[in-house]
Regions:
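Structured C-terminal cap/extension of enzyme domains
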Residues: 1-158
Length: 158
């Protein structure tokens, strides 16, 4: 909630007790900016160190909306998941999110890479400064993130 355009917090709570730590965090609400700034700086520095500052600053540039990609593969979301999974070791989180693709309708739209025809996608990546790298990154993302299809927490039995 450090950005003014963010007005909704999705915390993935499946049970009422899952809200406890979020409610406790409200005690620190007035200290958000000074608390978050050094944390964000360390995270961004680690991402830059692992993936390079150019990638971290520019990877979203020129990416098409998923409805403009053959077979509606959500390239921008897959690259976001790969970026955080690879640079911050958030693989478990990335797997959970990646495997929602194709399962969560409008809440998490688009398909994952299993449906991607690399030959068809080259034209829609042309505006990206990383157009040549992206097919390989998408393949790697699928390799490290694909597991069993997931359901949203609200639909799970746990």
């Amino acid at each position: 909630l450090n950005r003014p355009e963010v007005h909704t917090l999705s915390c993935g709570a499946a049970k009422p007790r899952d809200f406890d730590c979020h409610l406790e965090a409200l005690d620190h609400y007035d200290n958000i900016a000074p608390t978050i700034k050094p944390i964000e700086q360390r995270l961004r520095a680690e991402m830059d160190s692992v993936l390079g500052a150019d990638w971290c600053a520019r990877w979203p540039e020129g990416l098409p909306h998923y409805v403009d990609v053959p077979d509606e593969v959500n390239i921008s979301e897959i690259l976001r998941l790969w970026t955080y999974s690879k640079s911050l070791d958030l693989v478990d989180w990335g797997q959970m999110r990646y495997n929602l693709l194709g399962q969560a309708d409008h809440w998490f739209p688009g398909e994952h890479v299993a449906k991607l025809d690399v030959e068809k996608v080259a034209d829609c990546l042309a505006a990206s400064p990383f157009a040549e790298r992206i097919p390989g990154i998408l393949a790697e993302a699928h390799e490290i993130l694909h597991a069993a299809d997931q359901k949203r927490l609200s639909e799970s039995d746990d």
